[in-house]
Amino acid sequence: MSPNSRPGRPTVALIKWAAADGISEAIGLELAGLGYDVIPFQHDQPVPAAATVLTFAPHGRWWPVALQVGRLPAGDRPALIHWGTEGFPDPRTPWPLIAGLGRARSWLDALSDRPAAWQRRLARLPPVPALNRGLFRFRYVGDNLRAMRRGWLTGLADVSEWYARLYRKNGYPAQFVPWGTAPTWHADLKLERDIDVLWMGKRRNGRRSDLIDRVRRELAQHGVNMYMADGVERPFIFGEERTRLLNRTKLTLNVKTRWFNSGFTFRFHTVAGNRCVVVSEPFLPHVSRYQAGEHYAEAPPEELAQRILYLLAHDDERRALAERAYQLVTTEMTLRESVRKLIALPVPA
């Protein structure tokens, strides 16, 4: 138990994927606001004693955390709740292949945690290290399936309705818990919106990079500049600097890396609380509550620049979109509400 825990208050051990993990800190603040004593722990360190262990992402190896919980006597195990935020393999892949590859990838990753020395040596022999450097999304699924089968993972949620439904369809009781907006991610700074269009984040792959450049060229032909915070032209933006920049920005571009990508969710909840409008290409209905034309602007890839130009020329429409999105993410789809749903996931008897 944390030395700062107070008697009678439920305890939650909350994972941190880095020494400075802003997402974990935001979730921890919401848990504290809901009346929980929060015990942060690094993902590669011992899991502290608590009534509940809460993990998310993952941004590294998750299996050792589940293994620590699983090695405890059944009567002493905490509830282990995991909130998937890192996506899924291509959903066109047949489920038996997703599950089979996922379990195999998870098993390979877990070799280094085995008690037998020969198994740990096997983890260092080719081609195991090379295999462990790929197929991450399969590993995420495989870890979840193996931990649920063993009874260690008592609550599984995903930020995508689509992915949660895939789990349930195949016999795994995953729940949809949407991402939410934290109060520390937005402010009304009443600044002049002197930036027309913003791109923030990594380009990641050729598909996304090419489309960003295309939209940028087409806007430039009409005298509109795109502010680039891509880690190349300008540094990535975080915290107060990001909030300030979003308060100066009218529109933020969203471009997928893959056709099934769910990244819009995180961009939307970062942007909308600052009354900045997201302009996006179409994406899968990961969260049905988001409505194109109601909370964000949408256009096919080849029409994104034209949609941006239209909104810049019709300021009343842009402001109305911004206000509806702001109300959604600050009153209904907050991080507090998401964490409340997450921590209340049913624990099997």
Indicate residue ranges for each PLM-predicted region:
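Short, flexible helix/strand-to-coil boundary loops that buttress conserved ligand/catalytic motifs
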Residues: 290, 308, 322
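A charged, aromatic-enriched C-terminal amphipathic alpha-helix characteristic of glycosyltransferases
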Residues: 312-346
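C-terminal "capping" alpha-helix adjacent to the active site of nucleotide-linked donor transferases
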Residues: 300-317
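Short, hydrophobic/aromatic alpha-helical segments in well-folded domains
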Residues: 152, 267, 307, 324-325
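Nucleotide-sugar donor-binding catalytic core of glycosyltransferases
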Residues: 2-51, 55-76, 82-269, 273-292, ...
